[in-house]
């Protein structure tokens, strides 16, 4: 049994079954079966499906923002802002797909070079807990637009957000097996990545990314799209010190510090305010 709790109150937010090995295998088989037909659809049809997902997000924005807030401990305004980013990502992805996909030919000294983009297969997407909607959404939407099928495992800390996203995809009317969700912790994730996948799409910690690189070192057929977080220092060298102090505090503590953009180190010169 998997449960998530509101970190501010301790109240139960979500509970449900953890996906075991059989469920993982079944989801991957369904994704593999659905792939040829989904990949063969015209891009315009996939765009329409993603637009329906966007409409579902817009209709559920308040509820989804509240769910994100309750599971992560973010202020409600941050949860709503995250849903806004998810909605915006759809348009960005559609534009990027139109610019980058298809076939491109270039003249060469002894002929032509041809670049063709094609769907790759079954993509596994792992979601982090700090932006449980926006970050996995940034992988799922482009993957589906490109004609891949997706099996998504949210963070075990934010299953309710993942479930709400899955409801939006269901409302979009995707064919069976094109998008599936598996709830669970590390064991579920390891089972997913050990299965029949063609790619792993992940945004999260550098430590997790290093583990995945080692895990797939002997699988050159599996593409790895890893966006790995780290924290850079914030340098406040001159200017309005009072204003800089306000920005520093926001940078360190927004989203309770759980952002890759949160500064954990501050570099300042020695001045009338003292030494650092």
Regions found by a protein language model. Name each.
Residues 1-111:
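N-terminal Rossmann-like NAD(P)+-binding subdomain of aldehyde/semialdehyde dehydrogenases
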Residues 10, 46, 68, 90, ...:
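Residue-level signal for inorganic ion chemistry
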């Amino acid at each position: 049994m998997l449960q998530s709790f509101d970190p501010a109150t301790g109240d139960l937010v979500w509970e449900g079954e953890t996906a075991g090995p059989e469920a993982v295998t079944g989801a991957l088989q369904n994704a593999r079966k659905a792939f040829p037909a989904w990949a063969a659809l015209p891009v315009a049809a996939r765009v329409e499906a993603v637009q329906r997902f966007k409409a579902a997000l817009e209709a559920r924005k308040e509820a989804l923002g509240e769910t994100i807030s309750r599971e992560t401990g973010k202020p409600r305004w941050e949860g709503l802002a995250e849903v806004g980013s998810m909605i915006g990502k759809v348009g960005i992805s559609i534009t990027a797909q139109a610019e980058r996909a298809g076939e491109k030919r270039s003249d060469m000294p002894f002929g032509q070079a041809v670049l063709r983009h094609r769907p790759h297969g079954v993509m596994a997407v792992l979601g982090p807990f700090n932006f449980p909607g926006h970050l996995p959404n940034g992988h799922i939407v482009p993957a589906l637009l490109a004609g891949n099928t997706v099996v998504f495992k949210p963070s075990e800390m934010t299953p309710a957000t993942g479930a709400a996203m899955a409801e939006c995809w269901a409302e979009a009317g995707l064919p069976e097996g094109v998008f599936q969700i598996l709830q669970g912790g590390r064991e579920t994730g390891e089972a997913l990545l050990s299965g029949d996948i063609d790619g792993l799409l992940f945004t999260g910690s550098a430590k997790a990314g290093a583990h995945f690189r080692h895990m797939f070192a002997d699988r050159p057929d599996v593409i790895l799209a890893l966006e790995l977080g780290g924290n850079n220092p914030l340098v406040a060298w001159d200017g309005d010190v009072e204003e800089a102090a306000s920005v520093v505090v926001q940078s360190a503590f927004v989203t309770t510090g759980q952002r890759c953009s949160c500064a954990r180190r501050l570099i300042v010169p020695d001045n009338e305010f003292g030494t650092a």
